[in-house]
Amino acid sequence: CGKGQFISELASENLDINYIAIDLVDAMLGLAKRNVEAKYKEKNIEPKNIVLTRFDIERILLILEKQDEIERIYINFCNPWPKGKHRKKRLTHTRQLEKYRVFLKENGEIYFKTDDDDLFHSSLLYMEEAGFEVVKKTYDLHAEPIFEKNIETEHEKMFSDQGIKIKALIARKIEK
């Protein structure tokens, strides 16, 4: 969930949808908590539709299962794990996508954004291998928006300000 700017904006605009924000780093969760509280206070609403939790996403099936029927997963600027031996740790790796398939409802979606070219190209292949159809993709999100409303993350702004194009995709779970 990073610093929480993205999830606080998204959740506070969609009070009828419940959100789970996951991070492995306590410091990030602390920042996210403060940002969520500030955003909700600014809008004079209670943060009843969001839960922040510390968890290793590789073990996600310990807390989510088929009957949870998650509709959408957002993966924003995750670690690209560029070294070959570490690629299995990618949040978009086939091995991880297979786990998401368990609790993602049929036609559920993954929204993915990155600045990393190799991670993006590899993720396109991983999606296909894991039984996801890439329904939209762009190699320059700001020139070719594919999301109904793009909420810019801290990393997205930083990379864009450096002239790095943001790659993005929407993938849909399909029957294998």
Task: Show the residue positions of the predicted features.
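Short alpha-helix immediately C-terminal to the canonical SAM-binding loop
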Residues: L29-L31, F120
